[in-house]
Amino acid sequence: MEYLPIFIDLKNRPVLVVGGGAVAARKIHMLQRATITIVAPALCTELKKVLIKQNISWISKNFQPIMLNKVILVIVATNDSKLNTFIYQNAEKHNILINTVDDKNKCSFIFPAIIDRNPVLIGISSCGKAPILVRILREKLELLLPKSLGFVAKLAGAWRNKVKQHIVDTVLRRQFWEKIFYNGHVVTLMEKGRPKEANKVLNYALNNSVKNKNNKTGHVTLVGAGPGDIGLLTIRGLQVIQQADIILYDYLVNSDILDLARRDADKICVGKHVGNHSISQKKLNQFIVQLAQKGNKVVRLKGGDPFIFGRGGEELQAISEAGIAFQVVPGITAGIGVAAYSGIPLTHRKYAHSVVFITGHNTNGDNQFNWNSLSNNQQTLVIYMGKINAISIRNNLIIHGRNMHTPVAVISRGTYQDQKILIGTLIELEKLTQMADHPALLVIGDVVSLHSKINWFGQKALHYYLINSIINLI
């Protein structure tokens, strides 16, 4: 983070503005609560009007370093480069915050693009890197956020102390406000200009919450985080993550997804590496139950989809037996997401009429799978965690009739920017997996031959696509 985004109360604090043109006038509009002194030999018409309306001092002289005395912040809005440098050097010498308009190198702070729903304020910045992108984001957010948002915030502020007095427990208090805002009823009433009814709803909710304050019950949500790319997390998954008190996550979960959680949420890695289980499944099940019994909103965050080779069913059995409330948010499983990002359609009228998902962990045992069925040349075989037993997989498939020249893809870091795809044939599977990183997904079938024609994720236009996706999502 190049800049610290902070909101400063400038009420009655001394601020110096150097410059008397239209740019200075625009900046002064944001500093209305401050005690402003303008330094400029002459003022534009707009500033003269502002001078009459507001309590602003004007020094009709050239800038002198002594004018910085007792000032906490300086805005420089002149087109004199030498003067701007001189002011900047003096401000830096005295550790005074300074912003030189349109000259980032002479700034100790910069102004963000602002969305004002007083008292709700949103500042957006690219740290001076992409001002047009920031402008577009601001425009999108302006349309997205209701004009009544400020009234909702003021209403919440009016109730804040009363709620704090009646709900002493901080967790319960936060959950109360989450219910109010997520439910949307109060917001809708304020949008319609019906504050009296909104107050009644708040009063009813508070009384009801006080009656049930001893019934502090937690619950567990099993969430599929998708195969890696943060953009593949579902909207429902995002909502649940942002409400969680505790997140128990697998080591494969993208750290960017964890950053979406509340800052005060506990994030605990309970994942398993190949051959290295930090916690047994039985103990993990007990741990989840214990956390929920303490009244926490627990999110069990798993890579891919929790019900496909994720042991989600085992965990929910334990949670259900303990009488804990739970829900499931599906995710895009690696077999589907990674194949799509590799330009490999799992079914195709010409090449494959079915697809089978298996785990490669237990493929050493000859009786573990129906190899005759898996060796069908008209189907696609997707193998999770198949790197370790690649030799056994290859041998069993060929022995049971799969063509040794069947196209194969070994994909690691699937859906990430550094995704690695190794293409070969079934007879070469051992060599391919040796070159791949853990964990790796194996795709076996004639559909792999389409990779070279429809591998979209490696295209030059990718970055444009990603930026467009961000803007369109907002």
From Swiss-Prot:
<comment type="pathway">
    <text>Cofactor biosynthesis; adenosylcobalamin biosynthesis; sirohydrochlorin from precorrin-2: step 1/1.</text>
</comment>
<dbReference type="GO" id="GO:0051287">
    <property type="term" value="F:NAD binding"/>
</dbReference>
<dbReference type="InterPro" id="IPR014777">
    <property type="entry name" value="4pyrrole_Mease_sub1"/>
</dbReference>
<feature type="region of interest" description="Uroporphyrinogen-III C-methyltransferase">
    <location>
        <begin position="218"/>
        <end position="474"/>
    </location>
</feature>
<dbReference type="Pfam" id="PF13241">
    <property type="entry name" value="NAD_binding_7"/>
</dbReference>
<dbReference type="GO" id="GO:0009236">
    <property type="term" value="P:cobalamin biosynthetic process"/>
</dbReference>
<dbReference type="InterPro" id="IPR019478">
    <property type="entry name" value="Sirohaem_synthase_dimer_dom"/>
</dbReference>
<keyword id="KW-0597">Phosphoprotein</keyword>
<dbReference type="InterPro" id="IPR050161">
    <property type="entry name" value="Siro_Cobalamin_biosynth"/>
</dbReference>
<dbReference type="InterPro" id="IPR012409">
    <property type="entry name" value="Sirohaem_synth"/>
</dbReference>
<protein>
    <recommendedName>
        <fullName>Siroheme synthase</fullName>
        <ecNumber>2.1.1.107</ecNumber>
        <ecNumber>1.3.1.76</ecNumber>
        <ecNumber>4.99.1.4</ecNumber>
    </recommendedName>
</protein>
<dbReference type="Pfam" id="PF00590">
    <property type="entry name" value="TP_methylase"/>
</dbReference>
<keyword id="KW-0489">Methyltransferase</keyword>
<dbReference type="InterPro" id="IPR000878">
    <property type="entry name" value="4pyrrol_Mease"/>
</dbReference>
<feature type="binding site">
    <location>
        <position position="227"/>
    </location>
    <ligand>
        <name>S-adenosyl-L-methionine</name>
    </ligand>
</feature>
<dbReference type="InterPro" id="IPR037115">
    <property type="entry name" value="Sirohaem_synt_dimer_dom_sf"/>
</dbReference>
<dbReference type="GO" id="GO:0019354">
    <property type="term" value="P:siroheme biosynthetic process"/>
</dbReference>
<keyword id="KW-0511">Multifunctional enzyme</keyword>
<dbReference type="GO" id="GO:0051266">
    <property type="term" value="F:sirohydrochlorin ferrochelatase activity"/>
</dbReference>
<keyword id="KW-0520">NAD</keyword>
<comment type="similarity">
    <text>In the C-terminal section; belongs to the precorrin methyltransferase family.</text>
</comment>
<keyword id="KW-0169">Cobalamin biosynthesis</keyword>
<comment type="similarity">
    <text>In the N-terminal section; belongs to the precorrin-2 dehydrogenase / sirohydrochlorin ferrochelatase family.</text>
</comment>
<feature type="binding site">
    <location>
        <begin position="22"/>
        <end position="23"/>
    </location>
    <ligand>
        <name>NAD(+)</name>
    </ligand>
</feature>
<feature type="active site" description="Proton acceptor">
    <location>
        <position position="250"/>
    </location>
</feature>
<dbReference type="InterPro" id="IPR036291">
    <property type="entry name" value="NAD(P)-bd_dom_sf"/>
</dbReference>
<feature type="binding site">
    <location>
        <position position="414"/>
    </location>
    <ligand>
        <name>S-adenosyl-L-methionine</name>
    </ligand>
</feature>
<dbReference type="InterPro" id="IPR014776">
    <property type="entry name" value="4pyrrole_Mease_sub2"/>
</dbReference>
<dbReference type="InterPro" id="IPR003043">
    <property type="entry name" value="Uropor_MeTrfase_CS"/>
</dbReference>
<comment type="function">
    <text>Then it catalyzes the NAD-dependent ring dehydrogenation of precorrin-2 to yield sirohydrochlorin. Finally, it catalyzes the ferrochelation of sirohydrochlorin to yield siroheme.</text>
</comment>
<feature type="region of interest" description="Precorrin-2 dehydrogenase /sirohydrochlorin ferrochelatase">
    <location>
        <begin position="1"/>
        <end position="202"/>
    </location>
</feature>
<keyword id="KW-0456">Lyase</keyword>
<keyword id="KW-0808">Transferase</keyword>
<dbReference type="InterPro" id="IPR006367">
    <property type="entry name" value="Sirohaem_synthase_N"/>
</dbReference>
<dbReference type="GO" id="GO:0032259">
    <property type="term" value="P:methylation"/>
</dbReference>
<dbReference type="InterPro" id="IPR006366">
    <property type="entry name" value="CobA/CysG_C"/>
</dbReference>
<feature type="binding site">
    <location>
        <position position="385"/>
    </location>
    <ligand>
        <name>S-adenosyl-L-methionine</name>
    </ligand>
</feature>
<dbReference type="GO" id="GO:0004851">
    <property type="term" value="F:uroporphyrin-III C-methyltransferase activity"/>
</dbReference>
<dbReference type="GO" id="GO:0043115">
    <property type="term" value="F:precorrin-2 dehydrogenase activity"/>
</dbReference>
<feature type="binding site">
    <location>
        <position position="308"/>
    </location>
    <ligand>
        <name>S-adenosyl-L-methionine</name>
    </ligand>
</feature>
<feature type="binding site">
    <location>
        <begin position="41"/>
        <end position="42"/>
    </location>
    <ligand>
        <name>NAD(+)</name>
    </ligand>
</feature>
<keyword id="KW-0949">S-adenosyl-L-methionine</keyword>
